UniProtKB/Swiss-Prot annotation:
Keyword line: Aminoacyl-tRNA synthetase, ATP-binding, Cytoplasm, Ligase, Nucleotide-binding, Protein biosynthesis
Biological function: Catalyzes the attachment of tyrosine to tRNA(Tyr) in a two-step reaction: tyrosine is first activated by ATP to form Tyr-AMP and then transferred to the acceptor end of tRNA(Tyr).
Top-level taxon of the source organism: Archaea
InterPro entries according to UniProt: aa-tRNA-synth_Ic, Rossmann-like_a/b/a_fold, Tyr-tRNA-ligase, Tyr-tRNA-ligase_4, Tyr-tRNA-ligase_arc/euk-type, Tyr-tRNA_synthase
Protein's recorded name: Tyrosine--tRNA ligase
Binding site for ATP: K238
Family membership noted in the UniProt record: Belongs to the class-I aminoacyl-tRNA synthetase family. TyrS type 4 subfamily.
Catalytic EC class: ligase
Originating organism: Sulfolobus acidocaldarius (strain ATCC 33909 / DSM 639 / JCM 8929 / NBRC 15157 / NCIMB 11770)
HAMAP family for the chain: Tyr_tRNA_synth_type4
Primary localization: cytoplasm
Compartments it resides in: Cytoplasm
Length: 361
């Protein structure tokens, strides 16, 4: 794979790469790039997470030395799973099991736990230095990386440490690339801004889109919201299970949820069914989506790219229900091996049951 092919693979289906010029320069230097994705083991794994998981696969395929940070302490600070660290750790193992079922090559992925970082005094030295070089106002604004608003900094002081910890995660691992959803942008930009002051690498930030919830963006009262708050309002969320498809949902439930999802005829903007196709189904190269329909409605068709799918949908040549049913079939094909892995292990079945009974946000 040459440099142009690597850049195309790394940048496809991303919202932004900061910056592509820096990425190209690093690749041209022929250095072995180190990247990471960090995630909070905060509960049930929904299909929105498969977007960054697919990009993780792309980066590994492009030859980037990737690690994944199981951010257990971060989840505790963020009050996930009641702050129960043991339950959070189990949720981390569950998420790694999902990634393996999704086809992530775990032999090429280094797994790092927050415990590996926080036991090192040099890590906390970095946290203090990052905090020292960041204003209180900016630290509060960065709380959106936790799925919180700036005013929630008043909940407890540990919330203010969180952004400095995330920046330190990057510096401590001496990374070239930080992968995350667009909701992680403020942490990554903070890392880039502070890097020079601390004589650290200016990390390349790769941001994947957030999958809109099944309700779409058109049914929500979002007028006047800032972009971060708007995205937080419409995104698929495990705390709003009616808006989400979970990886353990039965095939019948997946189909039912998609049949009831927002997908107006010819409308692309904030359309969850189209987004699932763009970022998850067509996230892999060489995929075909088969639309099954009666001959009186045009007969079966095979769609070989997302661009083709979007075009015929806009032109009104594809009925929303036909698209929903085809999407359900293809999505279930993707979820099937994941469901089998999770359902075969009682500790994860019990975890899912426990979380479903106590979803708070």
């Amino acid at each position: 794979m040459n440099i142009d092919e690597k850049i195309k693979l790394i940048t496809r289906n991303t919202d932004e790469v900061i910056t592509i010029d820096e990425l190209k320069k690093k690749l041209e230097e022929n250095s072995k790039l180190k990247g990471y994705i960090g995630f909070e083991p905060s509960g049930l794994f929904h299909i929105g997470w498969l977007i960054w998981a697919q990009k993780l696969k792309d980066l590994i395929k492009a030859g980037v030395d990737m690690s994944i940070l199981v951010a257990t302490w971060h989840a505790m600070i963020n009050d996930k799973l009641g702050g129960d660290l043991e339950k959070i750790k189990l949720a981390g193992k569950y998420a790694l099991e999902v990634l393996e079922g999704f086809g992530v090559d775990m032999s090429k992925l280094k797994v790092v736990y927050a415990e590996d970082l926080v036991e090192n005094i040099d890590y906390w030295s970095l946290v203090v230095k990052v905090a020292k070089n960041t204003s209180l106002a900016r630290m509060k604004r960065a709380l959106t990386i936790m799925g919180r608003r700036s005013e929630e900094a008043e909940l407890d002081t540990s919330k203010l440490i969180y952004p400095a910890m995330q920046v330190s995660d990057i510096f401590f691992q001496d990374l070239d690339i930080a992968l995350g959803g667009t909701d992680q942008r403020k942490a990554h930009m903070l890392a880039r801004d502070v890097a020079e002051k601390l004589q650290r690498k200016k990390v390349i930030a790769i941001h994947t889109p957030l999958l809109v919830g099944l309700q779409g963006g058109q049914r929500m009262n979002t007028e006047g919201l800032e972009e971060d708050d708007y995205l937080a309002t419409i995104k698929m969320s495990k705390s709003k299970p009616e808006t989400a498809i979970f990886i353990h949902d039965s095939p019948e439930l997946v189909e039912s949820k998609l049949k009831n999802s927002y997908c107006p005829k010819g409308v692309v903007n904030d359309n969850p069914v189209l987004q699932i196709n763009k970022y998850i189904i067509f996230g892999e190269q060489g995929v075909t989506l088969k639309i099954e329909r009666d001959t009186k409605y045009g007969g079966d068709i095979e769609i070989k790219s997302y661009e083709e799918l979007e075009r015929i949908f806009i032109e009104g040549k594809l009925h929303p229900l036909d698209l929903k049913l085809a999407t359900a079939r293809k999505l279930n094909d993707i979820l099937d091996p994941i469901r089998k892995r999770i359902s075969s292990k009682s500790q994860f079945v019990d975890l899912i049951s426990s979380i479903e009974k106590s979803i708070t946000r």
